């Protein structure tokens, strides 16, 4: 309190100095009355020690969100609400977009890529919370190109240093199969094609697990194998009415896109089922093919663990067996094997190798032939190559004497 002054309103002596911008004021701390007010500076000499402040720094102009960023933030929130995601997911996706927008590689990108960033942030949030959402579903909602979306997704994950777990295959099956329009009768859906959702989902899960155990899923996009498994599950529940329906027509009835490799995955899955069917006693008498084996998928899935062990053998075990075979060949010849004593036509078929399809049918690669080396006989023979042919000490001594005689003959001048 300077000089014992008091507040003229309340009479309090609790006066404090308060610097309001460039003015120094004396204010009562009890009632807030301004007792004295400083004088504004009017001369340049009084402002000699002050610093100028730019307009953008004083008003916070640079901290404002641009129109494009505001539009994309609204799109992030709208996309989360369309997908019916929880509020925490929406907040996380918005924060990821704000971080991604600060990256130079994203801010300077094309408009097509910036529009994809919205879906990438939502997909990252769903993957981190184990929410079943596919990249194809996001691309369909945003009308985005799948290649651009996948490359942008990987770039954002790498630049932000995020830990994104892979989507659980069972959750993906449930989410993807729920989009099939096969569970309610409609004018475009015949009654014989309508199926119970729970039955088809449970059988599809078993078929996808079988495909995973037999290396059909590893390193491949999951949607084609899920589409093929769903088609087989749907056919096997009522085979008499549905065996004539093709995969393309099935996808058209279900109102889903047919993935390009789905037909190949279907043939691979049918080949596995045929191999398993050959191990069941009551199916060995039947001549099953890739069409008739669909009728017995229920029995094959019921005993799939045992049938996979019987129908296939591990590729690593096969290699070890081949290495151990020369060691025990003498003992096998003495004891004899009853299998090889049977006639050739009655021998049981050896189990197939349980290996990925890329190893069972490797792609053809062009091999360049090495250039043919023409040997004329006039090539120089090095000393190291000659030493390889000298076996005994006597040969070494004879070779040294021959070399000495040759040098002596070369040093003798020719007679006149």
From Swiss-Prot:
Keywords: Activator, Metal-binding, Nucleus, Oxidation, Phosphoprotein, Repeat, Transcription, Transcription regulation, Zinc, Zinc-finger. Sequence repeats lie at residues 72-157, 173-249. Residues 354-360 are annotated as: Required for the formation of a ternary complex with DNA and TBP. The modification Cysteine sulfenic acid (-SOH) is found at residue 358. The keyword Transmembrane helix does not apply. Pfam families: BRF2-like_C_cyclin_rpt (PF21886), Zn_Ribbon_TF (PF08271). One of its GO terms (biological process) is transcription preinitiation complex assembly. GO terms for cellular component: nucleus; transcription factor TFIIIB complex; transcription preinitiation complex. General activator of RNA polymerase III transcription. Factor exclusively required for RNA polymerase III transcription of genes with promoter elements upstream of the initiation sites. Contributes to the regulation of gene expression; functions as activator in the absence of oxidative stress. Down-regulates expression of target genes in response to oxidative stress. Overexpression protects cells against apoptosis in response to oxidative stress. Belongs to the TFIIB family. This is Transcription factor IIIB 50 kDa subunit.
